[in-house]
From Swiss-Prot:
Start-end of Basic residues biased regions: 309-319
Keyword annotations of the record: DNA damage, DNA recombination, DNA repair, Nucleus, Phosphoprotein
Keyword check for DNA repair: yes
Function: Regulatory subunit of the slx1-slx4 structure-specific endonuclease that resolves DNA secondary structures generated during DNA repair and recombination. Has endonuclease activity towards branched DNA substrates, introducing single-strand cuts in duplex DNA close to junctions with ss-DNA.
Post-translational modification: Phosphorylated in response to DNA damage.
Lineage of producing organism: Eukaryota, Fungi, Dikarya, Ascomycota, Pezizomycotina
Any one GO CC term of the record: Slx1-Slx4 complex
Protein name (Swiss-Prot/TrEMBL): Structure-specific endonuclease subunit slx4
Compositional bias segments (type: Polar residues): 57-68, 104-120, 151-168, 605-615, 630-645
Low complexity bias: start-end ranges: 38-56, 734-758
Disulfide links within the chain: none
Highest taxon listed in the record's lineage: Eukaryota
Localization in the cell: Nucleus
Length: 870
């Protein structure tokens, strides 16, 4: 603790010393009573004395640097034991409160100064009393402690010397008199708990100017930076939105299509001639807008611009032929008209004469446009239908329609489609017909066609579609026995070459392409047919032994047969005979038909007693290959029936055999086949005659309605007809062909197909892919014929009503989409329906259901009465 001296230095802000009054001090501790109470320091109140309120205004607060240096010098002065006191005790008390809180001097409000004045008046009146003395002691002790702490604040006065100390002391005292007046009110503010608000107010006064000026300087710097050429504002100016002028230009372009207020005002400001002309042209607002876009002051130039755009709609009407142009027409007119009218106005702006005739032109054009539109809207119904018939419609997207501007495009496309269809039909006709009885491996080795891959029959199995096209190839044309090459006569050439020399066959195999593995074996078989009739060559007999035999399906149960059918991916039928036939057909399609046909032909010989009328029948019976080759050639030739049938007469199968055998034998004996073949030009026609006879024999398995009647009712006359045809056709060269021996056993097989299952299976084995289908098709066709052949009957009405009503037939019910009960329909077919068509077979309810579903007929089973209870 520093010792406090009793010396007093009186400092005041004014020369008046009478303002300071010292009351009598009580006896006591000199250290405590050395400082005065702030209430006794000022006799008059601040409100009463005007000088007290003015003192703070004369002396400004010292700067921050002076205040800081004064604080340091006071500490030095206290070390040198310099005695400095302040006569203004109010400042001491206020500074004491600041030191207690560790804060600096705070400003004092006027309310606090008034409280100080009241305390001074009370002290004057009650000075001699004892309780006041006790209060003074407390305040004295309080000021004594404050004096110790005020050494740091009073040290603001720097005293290096006596002369300098007095001058330096005056400045902080004058400045503190105003601050002390504010700080005396701080104690009152502490009582009211208003420290935060007063702190903010105090800081406004004593805060250095640098802190307050810095943000202002920063703002000035930012403004300067924006104004500088290298500032941030110049850099960001390049990123500013400068689209105001562009938007105005766009607005002008868009508003050229119609009048606006601004344009009307401009028209009012123009000459009287323009006003008169504008009254004449109210129907075209586009022209008015286009006239004003150029802003010509001349009266006639805008009218010229008005008259010319009326010529532009003509090409636009041509563009409206497509759907895209019609949809986009209202959106494209503004841009097209604005560009065209601006150029026209610029070109005609110099012309200032001929305003009236131009206005007349616009009138005429305005009159012509509705006349051009009237007939479109006033079409009569007949004319409208005619116009629709004449119009060519093409369905597609708008982009495709827009591209088809030329009128020849549709015609070209139609012609191209027709040409492509012709090419397709030609390509289908050129396909060879020899891949039907080939093995599975040979089919995979050949070139596949999309149509053949997708072709399936009614049972879900792949249909026998022609795969290889070897007709047009020069190497394979020698070997294919086909009906498509009528003009070249390749069939008899092939027979002659094969029968004459076997070496030519080997050469042909060497020359044949790799894509024809199917047709290499079949011509070899045909060559052996002719050679075996004349020569005996048992070279190809081991081939029959290498192939597996047909399994005996009749010895298996129904479950085994159904499982075998499912292995082929087919649905097993309910009938056992159909299961066996289907399995035989699938096995033949998988393993090939050559061996199977040979075995079936041998069985058919023993059962039906069919014989060959050849010179050596024993040899023919020993060798199965002649029959195999015959059936193979027949199967190849029959596929060309549909293309050449109307121009070809008919012959029997026996005459065909004799033709081929006798012709080949004669050629082989004479050893000159080529010149004789050249001399014989009608032989290809006879080969096609054979084709037709083979197909007629197959037609008996799939008969037409007239063929069924002829077979069951008028079969003997048909034989006579066939014999007559044969005699007419083979009258000159083949007199032996008049024997009608071959069709008779086949017709008998066709008649007894429903009665004898053994013969039916034999018949199906001869041509297995077609037999089962054709039996089913026969029944389906018989059902359709029976339904259509049912006569309309009249049913008697009830006795109450009068007259009769017609009972609808099954055909009428089907046409009216009435639900057909399968039980009733099958019973009618088995009792009456099939008898109308002379059909002896009966139909199961499952087959009738399949027939109805295939025809798209609404069918259902009859609901039993027992089911209604549940």
């Amino acid at each position: 603790m520093m010792q406090i001296t009793t010396d007093f230095v009186v400092l005041s802000s004014s020369p008046e010393t009478s303002a300071i009054h010292f009351p009598p001090l009580p006896l006591g501790n000199s250290k405590i009573t050395s400082l005065r109470d702030p209430s006794m320091s000022l006799s008059p109140s601040p409100a009463a004395s005007p000088t007290a309120s003015k003192r703070s205004t004369f002396f400004s607060t010292p700067p921050y640097s002076q205040f800081k240096t004064a604080h340091k010098t006071t500490q030095d002065a206290s070390k040198e034991r310099t005695t400095t006191t302040k006569t203004d005790e109010n400042s001491a008390s206020s500074e004491n409160g600041c030191i207690r809180r560790g804060q600096k001097s705070q400003p004092i409000s006027q309310v606090e100064l008034q409280n100080i004045g009241q305390d001074n008046s009370e002290n004057k009146e009650n000075a001699p009393t004892k309780p006041k003395r006790a209060r003074k002691k407390q305040e004295g002790s309080r000021t004594g402690t404050e004096k110790l702490k005020n050494k740091t604040i009073s040290g603001k006065v720097t005293k290096t010397g006596m002369s300098k100390s007095r001058t330096s002391v005056i400045k902080p005292v004058k400045s503190k008199q105003g601050t002390c007046e504010r700080n005396t009110g701080k104690d009152g503010c502490e009582k009211d708990n208003l420290q935060l608000e007063l702190a903010m107010a105090r800081r406004r006064d004593w805060t250095p100017t640098k802190n307050a000026a810095n943000p202002v300087i920063d703002l000035d710097d930012e403004d300067d930076a924006t104004n500088r050429p290298d500032g941030l504002g110049t850099l960001l100016s390049g990123y500013e939105y400068t689209g105001m002028a562009i938007a105005s230009d766009r607005h002008k372009v868009l508003t050229n299509s119609g009048p606006t207020k601004r344009r009307r005002i401009e028209l009012i400001l123009t000459h009287h001639k323009q006003l008169v002309d504008s009254r004449v042209l109210p129907a075209k607002p586009k022209s008015l807008s286009e006239d004003d876009s150029v802003q010509n002051s001349e009266g006639e130039a805008p009218i010229c611009a008005v008259s010319k755009p009326s010529k532009k709609p003509k090409p636009k009407t041509k563009r409206l032929t497509t759907l895209t142009a019609r949809v986009t027409a209202p959106y494209d007119l503004s841009a097209n008209s604005s560009d065209s009218t601006v150029q026209e106005i610029l070109g005609t702006a110099e012309a200032s004469t001929g305003a009236k005739p131009k206005s007349r032109r616009t009138k005429r054009k305005a009159d012509e446009s509705p006349e051009y539109k009237v007939p479109r809207t006033l079409f009569s119904p007949e004319d409208a239908v005619k116009s629709l018939d004449q119009q060519e419609l093409v369905f597609g997207t708008c982009s495709q329609l827009q591209r088809e501007d030329s009128p020849d495009m549709l015609r070209d496309t139609q012609i191209a489609v027709q040409e492509s269809e012709k090419e397709f039909t030609r390509g289908m006709g050129r396909l060879s017909h020899t891949a039907r009885y080939s093995s599975v491996l040979s089919r995979l080795a050949t070139q596949r066609n999309l149509w053949s891959a997708a072709a399936r029959d009614t049972e879900g199995q792949l249909a026998d579609v022609e795969v290889v096209d070897l007709v047009d190839s020069p190497e394979a044309s020698k070997f294919i026995v086909s009906s498509l090459n009528n003009e070249k006569g390749t069939e008899d050439h092939s027979f002659a070459t094969y029968s004459s020399r076997s070496s030519e066959v080997l050469q042909a195999k060497a020359l044949a392409p790799a894509d024809a593995p199917i047709d290499e074996a079949l011509p070899a078989l045909t060559s052996h047919t002719v050679e075996q009739l004349e020569y005996e060559e048992p070279k190809n007999q081991p081939i029959t032994r290498s192939k597996p035999p047909l399994p005996y399906y009749k010895g298996k149960t129904d479950l085994q047969l159904a499982s075998e059918v499912r292995r082929y991916g087919l649905k097993p039928p309910k009938n056992r005979e159909k299961l066996i036939e289907l399995l035989e057909k699938c096995w033949v399609a998988k393993h090939g038909l050559d061996l199977q046909e040979a075995r079936e032909e041998l069985q058919s010989k023993t059962t039906a007693g069919m014989t060959f009328s050849t010179s050596e029948p024993k040899k023919v019976e020993q060798e199965p290959y002649p029959k195999q080759a015959k059936t193979a050639t027949q199967s190849k030739i029959t596929k060309a029936r549909s293309q050449f049938r109307p121009n070809v007469p008919e012959l029997t199968g026996k005459s065909r055999e004799t033709n081929t055998t006798t012709a080949v034998v004669k050629e082989d004996k004479q050893n000159n086949p080529k010149p004789k073949l050249k001399e014989r030009q009608p032989n290809p026609k006879r080969s096609f005659i054979d084709v037709e006879e083979i197909q007629d024999s197959e037609d008996e398995f799939l008969p037409s309605p007239s063929a069924i009647l002829n077979e069951f009712l008028v079969s003997p006359p048909r034989k006579g007809k066939q014999s007559n045809k044969d005699t007419k056709q083979n009258r000159q060269e083949l007199p032996t062909s008049t024997i009608p021996s071959s069709p008779s056993p086949k017709s008998s097989l066709a008649r007894d197909s429903s009665l004898s299952p053994t013969r039916q299976t034999k018949k199906s084995r001869t041509i297995p892919p077609v037999s089962v289908k054709r039996d089913l098709l026969d029944l389906g066709e018989q059902i359709t014929k029976a339904v259509r052949a049912q006569p309309r009957r009249k049913q008697n009405s009830n006795p109450v009503t009068t007259g009769t009503r017609k009972r609808p037939t099954w055909h009428e019910k089907i046409l009216m989409y009435d639900p057909i009960y399968l039980e009733d329909f099958t019973s009618w077919l088995n009792t009456e329906g099939l008898a109308l068509v002379d059909e002896d077979r009966e139909v199961a309810i499952g087959f009738v259901r399949q027939w109805c579903e295939s025809k798209g007929i609404c069918c259902c089973f009859r609901v039993k009465k027992t089911s209604e209870r549940f």
